[in-house]
Amino acid sequence: MKIYQKVLLFVATIFTIGTVSKEVHANEFNFSVNPVLPENQIGESGYFNLQMSPGQSQTLTISLKNTTDKTVVVEEEIASATTNINGVVEYSPNKIKADSTLKYNLVDYASIPKEVSLQPNSSQQVKVSVTMPKENFNGVIAGGITFKEKDSEKTNSKSKGLSIQNKYAYVVALLMKQNKNTVAPDLKLNSVEPSQVNYRNVINANLQNPKAGYLNQMYVQAEVKGLSNSKLSYKANKEMLQMAPNSNFDYPVSIGDGNKLEAGKYRLSMTVYGQKNNDGKFTYVDSKGKEQKFDYQWKFTKDFTILGKTASKLNSKDVTVKKTPWYENWLIWLGLLLILLALFFLFFILWKKRKKEEEEQDLEKEKLKAQLEAMREQISKEDNSDETDV
């Protein structure tokens, strides 16, 4: 089994994008990436942040440099920005489904060769074709361009058939907008349901950003209380989350390791703060006891039900939940008892039937025996009568 750890690099630090640091050393790569920023670039960031006219087409340039004495093949791919379960924006390809509100997917408006071959100790410019939609709109089309060395997986360790491999990649963010108009943020709560994260039971609250703008500096307070069982209460507070434009993600509320999900009715209460501002009208006390001011606040309340079969299924897969030995499960004992009773009842019916058949056979034998005795007596009488006549 392979465990791939994606390391996202080359996304610069800016409040509209977030912070992604270089977590691997340069010697992990056999090539370097340098975006050539065009004249319509907004700001001095190290990624593409373009202002374009409706319908405008443009070719971007990214310089790749092979720093080794061997040929390096680099795979290239474009992806739309998404939000992962940790409340972090991802710019690289992943399995997260596009949100229903995403009207302009970057994949449909940008293209790049699938791969490029870099000769030893050489540089090469890669061209990226981008086109702005013809319709006028406010907001941003967000995504990223990923560069990964082909077959670049590096095995760290092997043990009993398990190989842990790291896959390193450069990711250059690509933002496209028609103007600098601010998009008023919005946040919706779509659904609440039990699920699992890393084979541990959680209750997922799906949050959706339906607008074409980033939701930045999000602080979330969430609590799930049992309505069927008032003793049940689970909390999950997180700070400094971010959501990509037109995206959604599952915010997990852990029920704690070793705890079983219980069937019944529940209520989720959630408060989300967004965009720090010292003059903001909404106050949040952070984990350090310090007051934080925000421009936006959303409050959600939603009731939901966990079915018994759903709870049982998830509990059986939770690696932290102690599994009840079969001999301690009263349902198994009840089942065995019912089977024994059924077998006893069946045996009793068969025994009664067989006994009845035997009694009927004995009765027939007695009747036959009586008939034979009667015939014998009749014959004997007839013989005696004949002797008298003689």
Regions of interest found by a model, annotated:
Residues 97-136, 227-261:
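Intrinsically disordered, low-complexity Pro/Gly/Ser/Thr-rich segments with frequent PxxP/GP/PP motifs
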Residues 2-26, 332-351:
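Sec-dependent N-terminal signal peptides of Gram-positive bacterial secreted proteins and lipoproteins
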Residues 180-188, 192-329:
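Membrane-proximal extracellular "stem/stalk" segments
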Residues 355-390:
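Cytoplasmic C-terminal tails of single-pass
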Residues 54-61, 123-126, 138-144, 199-203:
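Short, solvent-exposed loop/turn segments enriched in Ser/Thr/Gly
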Residues 72-94, 131-179, 260-317:
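Terminal connector regions
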Residues 65-70, 81-83, 135, 208-214:
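Short solvent-exposed strand-capping/beta-turn motif centered on an Asx-Ser/Thr pair
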Residues 29-57, 194:
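N-terminal edge beta-strand
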